[in-house]
Swiss-Prot record:
It holds the Pfam family DMRL_synthase. The active site is at H95. This is 6,7-dimethyl-8-ribityllumazine synthase 1. GO terms for biological process: riboflavin biosynthetic process. Catalyzes the formation of 6,7-dimethyl-8-ribityllumazine by condensation of 5-amino-6-(D-ribitylamino)uracil with 3,4-dihydroxy-2-butanone 4-phosphate. This is the penultimate step in the biosynthesis of riboflavin. GO terms for cellular component: cytosol; riboflavin synthase complex. GO terms for molecular function: 6,7-dimethyl-8-ribityllumazine synthase activity. Gene3D superfamilies: Lumazine/riboflavin synthase. SUPFAM superfamilies: Lumazine synthase.
Length: 163
């Protein structure tokens, strides 16, 4: 049986030339490199361009996305979509829950409030092994998944704008 998570979406609304922001948390450099590689490959395949903004950790990603959206709009070069990339590994305290839940909530709030296409590629895992399995482009490729999600939402936005 085909993996339903990988089934191509039928909407092929053109997203070539889209300007996409990637905000990445560089807390785990090697894992982040893999997430970024997967996301960039998907954007290139779709003909989208991208800028990368780096922040210290996952909690800083939502604010950085909001700041960048505002700055780009003010400069007359608005972003069409954004991708959040990072990794949160469970430790011995509740910090994991706070970071994973609050970053996801803030990204969702931002996307809904601004009607802005956003793919969340902040992986939340129990172990380094789980992180690698999710980050590698040849494996679960969560960076690529986040890019596909952002582009899918952009396609919906563009298609409905024409209706």
């Amino acid at each position: 049986m085909a993996d339903a998570r990988r089934a191509p979406l039928k909407d092929q609304t053109d997203v070539s030339g889209a300007r996409v922001l990637i905000v990445e948390a560089r807390f785990y450099d090697d894992i982040q490199d893999a997430l970024l590689e997967g996301a960039v490959a998907e954007l290139k395949a779709a003909g989208a361009t991208h800028d990368v903004l780096t922040v210290p950790g996952a909690l800083e990603i939502p604010a950085a996305v909001a700041i960048a959206i505002d700055s780009a709009e003010a400069a007359g070069k608005p972003y069409d979509a954004a991708i959040a990339l990072g990794c949160v590994v469970r430790g011995e305290t509740i910090h994991f829950e706070i970071v994973s839940m609050e970053s996801a909530r803030a990204l969702m709030d931002l996307s809904v409030a601004r009607k802005f296409p956003l793919g969340n590629g902040i992986i939340t895992v129990n172990t380094d092994e789980q992180a690698w399995a999710r980050a590698k482009p040849g494996d679960l490729n969560k960076g690529g998944d986040a890019a596909r999600a952002a582009l899918a939402m952009l396609r919906i936005k563009r298609r409905l704008a024409k209706a």
